[in-house]
């Protein structure tokens, strides 16, 4: 079984499809390693039936997109699209099953709403900048990270944003309070997952009695204002804001980057929509989390390692070790375990026969 990103399908070398070359070489490894006596292989898709077969029974697919697995169609709460193929030795007369479509897609809210509500961490505040030797040097002040300070800062952001935009004016939201869980921790004792969670049986370990790796990172104060705007905007408009929406509200919401006004990163700050599968969790989440903003404005933060792990369908008892950056990398670089299990069952059936 081999996996790669969907972009592989459009890659070319000397006008030849890289994926076609890979399939050719995998079908006949001896053509690459001349001295080997390797068997030949039949290359199958795990989600589509072949369009036809060669005289020796090898499958033919008219479109390489037949090898793309869209994870959200197979019980994963994430729009993760990857090329995955299955090779079977040609002397084994077996046609593998394909993955079974889920009855319905699982949305983000369904798999993370039962994790404890926690606040964002406070790190530092941007003060000023100057150009030194042609490069911009930015200056920051450290910010005291405690519940009281956080509530004052985020409440002021919410008040300003709602007064200017009218977001949620008709809402009957209760007064914001600090979660008893604060910024969370590497282990938060709690009752999770709930039985209503669509992947309860997969996530749950009754011996765990809590959530691992559920701690928010420290954030730049200016970013928290952007997060508050983004989550309130999303809650009102059912879509996340583009940079032009930030600018329309207030120019001080634009990030201090040259590319802010180029349109190159129009979706740099992205709220994950609660009623849809999440976008692809990648290792880039380790950098700043701007592409993975929590939809709840009362938490005003990016996703934790455990929330990202839920999206990737890691069971709750899977503990990620090392620095938090490394933890995010481990989550983002993985094939979703729930998808891997389904693929493993197909392979297991082949081996049994």
Task: Give the residues covered by each predicted segment.
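A general structural signal for short secondary-structure junctions and capping/turn motifs
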Residues: 57-61, 73-78, 100-106, 114-120, ...
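A generic secondary-structure signal for well-formed alpha-helical elements
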Residues: 9-12, 22, 26-33, 89-92, ...
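Short catalytic/ligand-binding loop motif for oxyanion handling, primarily in non-cytosolic enzymes
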Residues: 7-12, 75-78, 93-96, 289-291
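Short linear interaction motifs
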Residues: 62-68, 95, 257-264
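C-terminal target-recognition/interaction regions appended to catalytic cores
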Residues: 130-353
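Conserved Class I SAM-dependent methyltransferase catalytic core
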Residues: 1-73
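Conserved proline-anchored active-site loop of SAM-dependent methyltransferases
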Residues: 1-5, 85-89, 281, 332, ...
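Flexible, glycine-/basic-rich loop-and-beta segments that form/coincide
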Residues: 66-127
């Amino acid at each position: 079984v081999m996996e790669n990103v969907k972009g592989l399908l459009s890659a070319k070398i000397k006008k030849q499809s890289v994926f076609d070359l890979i399939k050719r070489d995998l079908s006949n490894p001896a053509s690459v390693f001349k001295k080997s006596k390797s068997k030949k292989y039949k290359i199958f898709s795990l989600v589509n039936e072949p369009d036809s077969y060669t005289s020796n029974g090898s499958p033919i697919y008219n479109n390489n997109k037949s090898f793309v697995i869209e994870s959200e169609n197979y019980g994963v709460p994430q729009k993760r699209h990857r090329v995955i193929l299955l090779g079977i030795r040609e002397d084994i007369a077996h046609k593998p099953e394909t993955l079974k479509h889920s009855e319905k897609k699982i949305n983000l809210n369904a798999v993370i709403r039962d994790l404890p509500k926690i606040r964002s961490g406070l790190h530092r505040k941007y003060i000023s900048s100057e150009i030194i030797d042609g490069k911009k040097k930015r200056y920051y002040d450290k910010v005291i990270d405690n519940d009281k300070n956080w509530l004052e800062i985020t409440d002021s952001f919410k008040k300003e944003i709602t007064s200017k935009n009218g977001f949620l004016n008709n809402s009957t939201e209760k007064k914001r309070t600090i979660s008893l869980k604060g910024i969370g921790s590497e282990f938060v004792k709690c009752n999770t997952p709930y039985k209503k969670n669509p992947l309860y049986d997969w996530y749950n370990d009754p011996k765990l009695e809590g959530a691992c790796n559920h701690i928010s990172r420290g954030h730049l104060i200016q970013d928290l204002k952007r997060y508050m705007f983004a989550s309130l905007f999303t809650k009102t408009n059912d879509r996340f804001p583009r940079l032009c929406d930030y600018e329309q509200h207030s120019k001080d919401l634009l990030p201090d980057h040259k590319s802010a006004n180029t349109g190159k990163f129009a979706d740099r700050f992205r709220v994950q929509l609660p009623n849809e599968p999440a976008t692809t969790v990648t290792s880039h989440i380790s950098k700043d989390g701007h592409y993975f903003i929590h939809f709840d404005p009362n938490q005003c933060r990016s996703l934790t390692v455990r929330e990202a792990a839920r999206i990737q369908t890691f069971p709750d008892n899977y503990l990620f070790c090392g620095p938090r950056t490394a933890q995010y990398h481990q989550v983002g670089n993985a094939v979703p375990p729930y998808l891997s299990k389904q693929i493993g069952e197909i392979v297991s059936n082949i081996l049994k026969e």
